[in-house]
Amino acid sequence: MKINVNGIEMYYEKCGQGRPLVLVHGNGVDHNEFQNSMWLLRRHFTVYAVDSRGHGLSTPVDELHYSDMADDMAAFLAQLDLRDVVCFGHSDGAIIGLMTAMRTDRIGLLLAGSANMTPQGAAAWLRLALRAAYAVTKSPKLRLMLTEPNITVEELATITTPTVVIAGSKDLIDERETRLIAESVPGAKLRIFEGDDHSSYVVPKTRLADLILEEAASYAL
C-alpha cells in the first residue's frame, strides 16, 4: 500500500490486528528487514512496516534528511489516525523514531535500536568506508550517514514518550553515545545486549518479536 505524505508516496505493508506497531528499517534496506518478524508479531499487533523516503518502494529522492523522514512518519501516523503506537526503529529507523517522538504524541512506546546522535557516534572504520564509497557513488543514503544526525541532548529531553534505548555490546554505535541517549530522554530504559552487534538482535525473527512483546507488555496501559 502507498500513502501520500509531504509530497512523496510512502509504501507500507500491513498485517495482523491489535495495537498498532510501526517498524522502521535502517539505511539502505527497506521493510523487508522485518519480513520474518512481521508474521509472528501480527498475532499480537496490527503491524505497519514502512519504507522511508528514498528506500524500497517509496518515492526516490535526490537528498535525504532525517528531519524530512521524521516529518513523513509523523504525517503517516496522523493520516492513518494511529494512536498509542508501539514504534520499533532500527539504526536509521531508530533515529527517525526518536525525531518523530519529538513531533507527535501518537507514539505510546518507542523502542530505539542502535541509534546515534551524531555521525561521530558511528565506528571510525565505518565512517572511513562510507567516505570511500560516497566518493564513488555520491549516494544520498551514504551522504546522510556522513553528515547527520545532529541530535542534541536538549532535543532528546523534550521526548515524553516512554522509550527503551537498545544496542549490542559489539554495536557499530559508540556505547557512550547510546548511554547518553538513554540518559537524555526522560525516564528512558537502557538495554545493551551482551555479545550482540548492530543487527544480531534484530535479524532472528523470534528475538525481535520477543523483545517487542516483552517491552510492550511492560509498558501496557
What annotation goes with each model-predicted range?
Residues 95-103, 110-136:
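Flexible "cap/lid" loop of the alpha/beta hydrolase fold
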Residues 159, 165-167:
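Short beta-strand/loop motif that positions the catalytic acidic residue
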Residues 172-177:
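Conserved alpha/beta-hydrolase "acid-adjacent" motif
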Residues 188, 194-221:
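Catalytic active-site module of serine/aspartate enzymes centered on a nucleophile-bearing elbow/loop
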Residues 48-86, 210:
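Active-site loop/oxyanion-hole signature of alpha/beta-hydrolase fold enzymes
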Residues 27, 85, 89-90:
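Conserved alpha/beta-hydrolase "nucleophile elbow" surrounding the catalytic nucleophile
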Residues 8-57:
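Conserved HGGG/HGGXW glycine-rich cap/lid loop of the alpha/beta-hydrolase fold
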Residues 140-155:
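Active-site nucleophile elbow and catalytic-triad environment of alpha/beta-hydrolase enzymes
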